[in-house]
Amino acid sequence: MKLSRRSFMKANAVAAAAAAAGLSVPGVARAVVGQQEAIKWDKAPCRFCGTGCGVLVGTQQGRIVACQGDPDAPVNRGLNCIKGYFLPKIMYGKDRLTQPMLRMKDGQYNKEGEFTPISWDQAFDVMEEKFKASLKEKGPEAIGMFGSGQWTVWEGYAAAKLFKAGFRSNNIDPNARHCMASAVVGFMRTFGMDEPMGCYDDIEQADAFVLWGSNMAEMHPILWSRITNRRLSDPNVNVAVLSTFQHRSFELADNGIVFTPQSDLVILNYIANYIIQNNAINQDFFSKYVNLRKGTTDIGYGLRPTHPLEKAAKNPGSDASEPMSFDEYKAFVAEYTLEKTAEMTGVPKDQLEQLAQLYADPKKKVISYWTMGFNQHTRGVWANNLVYNLHLLTGKISQPGCGPFSLTGQPSACGTAREVGTFSHRLPADMVVTNEKHRDICEKHWQIPTGTIPAKIGLHAVAQDRALKDGKLNVYWVMCNNNMQAGPNINEERMPGWRDPRNFVIVSDPYPTVSALAADLILPTAMWVEKEGAYGNAERRTQFWRQQIKAPGEAKSDLWQLVQFARRFKTEEVWPEDLLAQKPELRGKTLYDVLFATPAVSKFPLTDLAEDQLNDESRELGFYLQKGLFEEYAWFGRGHGHDLAPFDDYHKARGLRWPVVDGKETQWRYSEGHDPYVKAGEGYKFYGKPDGKAVIFALPFEPAAEAPDKEYDLWLSTGRVLEHWHTGSMTRRVPELHRAFPEAVLFIHPLDAKTRDLRRGDKVKVISRRGEVISVVETRGRNRPPQGLVYMPFFDAAQLVNNLTLDATDPLSKETDFKKCAVKLAKV
């Protein structure tokens, strides 16, 4: 049989799609597959961002040999971005870790020793010794974990269960604290429930798109392709893009707005004022479904209590608010006039009016998208609340083509970090550790003694750094992230604690990252389809995949590491006598026994797996671990607006958007006819709030924690580029992606470069009050900062831009502001 290249590719795609869907394969496609020595195809969500694209993975002889966009995936419809097309190569970097490595000298652990290969038993021996010593000397507050929005659903659930119920420590937090915490608190304050009410299907039905601090063209390129298609197919569709510098998303914008850093708060209040002044309030919606509250102000910047800015704040960390009347709210936003807004933001008046008109026009369906520009902000929660105000004033919410939409940056920042309760203050399904009723629900469901879960909120990400430095946190397990490179203020607040001889730091990772090389023990980790997994994307879509290949060498999944390490602790070693007295039958049992081998978790047999299906963890334990953990976790949300489908349904589908009730997913929450929790005749119901009403908040402009001055005369903003994902620990090991963008550069306005005698390609030292880094001047290209601002990506381990950043956070969400600090430049 002869086939052209075109026919070959087409037949191959058909074979892949059919195999993954469990369908019969046409004869010509079967022949092609046969010629390829039976490549096996299966579905998986992409390993990278929070979009949640579906891919088809081709494996042969124990390796991934091909990958392509899944034509049946509703998110991406067969398309991949540049990173997605190179997914197989992230698995096969030359420096992939294959065995545990401990710092040793003269055959013993030594903080200053060289990394030496050891066995898993030896690794767990050292970890056990360190954990038990700290627990005995200082108690649960001396241990901690920093996890990930890249954990699978059951990995995050197992980690939260092990720390909060097993070790009785709430000192567990995910790296989603650095990217999505402000979105979470914003959702909770306004709606009483986390995560977006809309979905990606809004794109094809919207009349206008407004991007707030979001470069979707590079950070969510597949969604951007759908927006581009919508914009170019209808001349009446509008796109507005707001940022502190021009980037690739501006190329499509009808209204591209560059504003002074932090002044987005002013623009948001101006639009609310415009809506009111032009009688554009949806009075019927507003009167039935909205409450008004005035927020507490002057809340500080999440810095150490001894910092002058914290000392000066009148209400540091306060999230209090009080009811207010409409007239009071009207008077509050009336201060944000067009003239004042233009002056404070640097945005021309006509551009501001054009933007406000999109929201005010009752005939325009508007979607607001935002990512890190909003969230990584010392008033990120306020920014989230203020954009909700615009949609609540106009009623443009919870309907096809209308709504506010917080985009996530990690593949399971929603499905894992947020939903299963891996934040230091959270429990599954939006429950929190400070609520006695919520703790009781968890303790009863987990069949552990009452009072096991601590009521005190644990250490969040930045607080963990500070506690390590201060010697209060002494054993620290970092999983599935590279926080030494990604977190703020490396020199002053992170590195000192990691290298403090009082502390022991473990890093679980597939590669020797900056974090791994700063640790004391490195555990080699299985990644992506080397394990069975589940992610939850930005539109509430939960997606499963099967294990498709084995991990190299002795690399083990995060789930295996957590569950097996739990065997090292008996209940009497971690729980006080008063707890054991409640359930004496738990004496002598290990944390593995009481958390992971319970009847509820272990009841699903291996026969639920196909005979030839890989699943290393379950086959080692003798029961279907992932299914047991998922079903135990899913119980928390069922009947409470977070309903997940039965486990097996997800392996058959291309993901389902919760709540899933009676087998049907939900596209638009809170509205009648779309959401099963909204009854006939209710219209809208924001059922996260006791009265079913959302909240409009009155919140003012407050300045950034640090701004340029005479000495440090430039704003610095950090972020990503299309070719690399986060710290580049995966993408920089893909030769094609590395060649496309080999090193970080400093994007700067040509006039700012000229006044400093700098030219494109020159080496330049970037200096802040905390550190310095040498980069390369770039006056052209994709990012075009205004005068007074420079932009630098953080993917390059040789240019640690977070040596420069300030560890100021939003005081409510504890999320770091990576977008605003002051720097100066010196020619090298």
UniProtKB/Swiss-Prot annotation:
Signal peptide as annotated in the record: 1-31
Residues annotated for [4Fe-4S] cluster binding in this entry: 46, 49, 53, 81
SMART domains to which the protein is assigned, alphabetical: Molybdop_Fe4S4
UniProt keyword list: 4Fe-4S, Electron transport, Iron, Iron-sulfur, Metal-binding, Molybdenum, Nitrate assimilation, Oxidoreductase, Periplasm, Signal, Transport
GO biological process: cellular respiration; Mo-molybdopterin cofactor biosynthetic process; nitrate assimilation
UniProt cross-references to InterPro entries, sorted A to Z: Asp_de-COase-like_dom_sf, CT_Nitrate-R-NapA-like, MoPterin_dinucl-bd_dom, Mopterin_OxRdtase, Mopterin_OxRdtase_4Fe-4S_dom, MopterinOxRdtase_cofactor_BS, Periplasm_NO3_reductase_lsu, Prok_molybdopt-oxidoreductase
Entry keyword annotation includes Iron-sulfur: yes
Molecular function (Gene Ontology), one example: iron ion binding
Enzyme class label: oxidoreductase
Cofactor note: Binds 1 [4Fe-4S] cluster.
Posttranslational modification: Predicted to be exported by the Tat system. The position of the signal peptide cleavage has not been experimentally proven.
Cellular localization per UniProt: Periplasm
Cofactor entry: [4Fe-4S] cluster; Mo-bis(molybdopterin guanine dinucleotide)
Any GO CC annotation of this UniProt entry: membrane
Binding positions for Mo-bis(molybdopterin guanine dinucleotide) per the UniProt entry: 83, 150, 175, 179, 212-219, 243-247, 262-264, 372, 376, 482, 508-509, 531, 558, 718-727, 802, 819
Tree of life domain: Bacteria
Domain 4Fe-4S Mo/W bis-MGD-type positions: 39-95
Residues given in the record as substrate binding sites: 794
Coiled coil: none
Catalytic activity annotation: 2 Fe(II)-[cytochrome] + nitrate + 2 H(+) = 2 Fe(III)-[cytochrome] + nitrite + H2O
EC number: 1.9.6.1
Subunit field text: Component of the periplasmic nitrate reductase NapAB complex composed of NapA and NapB.
Protein's job: Catalytic subunit of the periplasmic nitrate reductase complex NapAB. Receives electrons from NapB and catalyzes the reduction of nitrate to nitrite.
Family per similarity comment: Belongs to the prokaryotic molybdopterin-containing oxidoreductase family. NasA/NapA/NarB subfamily.
Name of protein: Periplasmic nitrate reductase
Species name: Citrobacter koseri (strain ATCC BAA-895 / CDC 4225-83 / SGSC4696)
